[in-house]
Amino acid sequence: MAVLLQLTVAPGTQDQFNELDAKVGQSMSEAGGPPAGLMSHAVYPEGDGFVIAEVWRAEEEGQRYMGDVLRPLLAELGLTGQDNVVRPVWSFARP
């Protein structure tokens, strides 16, 4: 079942997110493309940080990516992500 994974990073600025985004892009380029199972990705500001919101085909794929790739990149930048919030996705549509 598809899931929405949300990771809140706080504190975190837009400049820090931009650095993270560049590192994630480099990682994806080295891996030959986006991670398997990623269906959509969005980031929005919240409070003194930002939230990474992604829809994954399966929770295990998203948790593995966050643990193996995203959290280490956050740590490289001195950022901390809170516990993932996981929600089931009942419907997903692409235009």
Where are these regions (language model features)?
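Short S/T/G/P-rich N-terminal loop/turn motif that feeds into the first structured element of a domain
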Residues: 1-71, 79-95
